[in-house]
Amino acid sequence: MDPKTSAGQCPVMHGANTTAAQSNTAWWPNALNLDILHQHDTKTNPLGEGYRYREAVKQLDVAALKADLTALMTRSQPWWPADWGHYGGLMIRMAWHAAGSYRVADGRGGAGTGNQRFAPLNSWPDNANLDKARRLLWPIKKKYGAKISWADLIVLAGNVAYESMGLKTYGFAFGREDIWHPEKDIYWGSEKAWLAPTGGEGSRYSGQRDLENPLAAVMMGLIYVNPEGVDGQPDPLKTAQDVRVTFARMAMDDEETVALTAGGHTVGKSHGNGSAANLGPAPEGADVHEQGLGWNNHSSRGIGRDTVTSGIEGAWTTHPTQWDNGYFKLLLGYDWELKKSPAGAWQWEPVGIKEDDKPVDVEDPSIRLNPIMTDADMAMKMDPAYRRISERFAADQAYFSEVFARAWFKLTHRDLGPKSRYIGPEIPAEDLLWQDPVPVGPTAYDVGAVKSRIATSGLSVGELVATAWDSARTWRGSDYRGGANGARIRLAPQKDWAGNEPERLARVLAVLEPIAAAAGASVADVIVLAGNVGVELAAKAAGFDVTVPFAPGRGDATQAQTDVESFEVLEPVADGFRNWQQRSFAVQPEEMLLDRAQLMGLSAPEMTVLVGGLRVLGANHGGSKHGVFTDRVGALTNDFFVTLTDMAHAWVPTGRNSYEIRERASGVVKYTATRADLVFGSNSVLRAYAEVYAQDDSREKFVRDFVAAWVKVMNADRYELQG
């Protein structure tokens, strides 16, 4: 050590280099966070660039894995004993809470990435002690290694848990790929504290309890609703409304909601036999010697019957390790009264219950204890619509089991995408409407002849490109929905979306559909081919001969295969790529552009080159001239970037989201723009990309890069091409 270094000085890295010190966004909170476009790359993946999970998992011995999981369920470990000798309830809660973070509005969250291993989810109050479930799974994950992802294993463990307790599940599909660091793009809410009540700083509620979009949980740190009641105040009818909203935001109807609520609480128990004050920090805040485990109780026994998790204490059913419909028989068969758990949480307990209807203690079968219900459970009895469904399930266990099995499959597979992404021997044969089915399309047609007919159809470059873009831009990598495959742009609701310019769209489709029919091609393929033709014509006008890669085989979905309500969440309210937004929003246009780029799986350079190209192709919504910094509209030039970076121009605000570019010398207005244009000159990172494309030696590079990014967008939903 340098003798000049005092004992109080650090001779190596300072904390600012290794810990979460003040970041650029902390110093400049309004700066655009481009980090959301640069996640989950090969630098963070320890499995290497050549590893392909979707190929590796096909080598998995599924029967052996399921046998090991089944054995795990009843192999209680002394460091975290199984309730009644069965880990089923714990494993189901782990899988449920992984899948339950999904929200349909933006497709983010869910079980598809194994994100429950990382902050913030690994330390949410609602996920307390699920770290123990994952540690119990570790020997199995260790054994099967890279052939099974954590994401798949977590969900499969829940499935096997149900099967081990007597439920015939609907099926299972592999294919979920792990991420290796926390997601940076998911907005979980603005609250500054866990479980912050309504009305506090950053509250997610406004008006008459209107939940902020796209959120699908009532509090920061919860998966769905507060089990004690709205803001911790029991009132089953009020809680019923919270339940209905949160489950709807996961695309569940009332029957699925009742089935999932009851099915999740048919097995296992809630834990609150002690004081939460004795619990240590959550995993992310625990000391190094805790080795990633949180909520450890070093003040009392803290395991088995003395476990504290939610604070509510007790099982819901008489036989918590057995699949049946006893949940409804207790819920509907008894009156219930409010009580406090040993941990001080509100819970409902039955009045005058028969001794035989009580579940036994998790450690001593000679002891029987009251079952409990949460406020959400009581909503299944008190809400009239939920009550009717509950009564039917109580009367028909087979029907309840079937509805639950299907709803559980939907819950755990919704963010896996369409059926073409499913892998494994237990894929259900039935096509389900929520899977957005698309038939296989034809491939044996003359692509060249179709392109020739499109090129001579009289449609402009802008019309060709905009129509293809609108068809493909709905794809989102969060839950693999949307995209050009299926040509749903010609069906309700997409054909009537304002962002798709219905009149222009109908005119273009009237030209393209006969071309498809005559050639024996799908309309979906021809729409993409039309965009490709537009790009090729534009490149030629700029002096470059290019052939845009194309793979036939897209199918045409029918209206019957399209759930109109489900697709409404894919409607764009803004598209910075086409310089359009439906109205003014609290969020700036450039932030909405960035969010769409992230959902589309684009990098910052790809976003940059696509915006610059689409501007000069005349693809703006409604023929807007904003950002069209060229005198050669329809030619794929780098004029957008050349103009943007030219200091001969000055930019002058003319409204909230409108600007003029003026010649500095004369003051003459040359062009107009929006924030979605100017951000490429104002943001230091985006300007660096813009300068590359503005260079004199980058004209061809710009064209090549635009084509590559364009093809990526057009093929985003061609999963059969991706392996």
From Swiss-Prot:
The reactions it catalyses are:
H2O2 + AH2 = A + 2 H2O; 2 H2O2 = O2 + 2 H2O
Q: Which residues form the active site?
A: 97 (proton acceptor)
Cross-link Tryptophyl-tyrosyl-methioninium (Trp-Tyr) (with M-250) maps to 96-224
Which GO terms of type biological process are on file?
cellular response to hydrogen peroxide; hydrogen peroxide catabolic process
Q: How is it modified after translation?
A: Formation of the three residue Trp-Tyr-Met cross-link is important for the catalase, but not the peroxidase activity of the enzyme.
Q: Which SUPFAM superfamilies match?
A: Heme-dependent peroxidases
List cofactor names only. Answer: heme b
User: Subunit arrangement?
Assistant: Homodimer or homotetramer.
Q: Return the protein name.
A: Catalase-peroxidase
Q: Which organism is it from?
A: Leptothrix cholodnii (strain ATCC 51168 / LMG 8142 / SP-6)
Lineage of origin: Bacteria, Pseudomonadati, Pseudomonadota, Betaproteobacteria, Burkholderiales
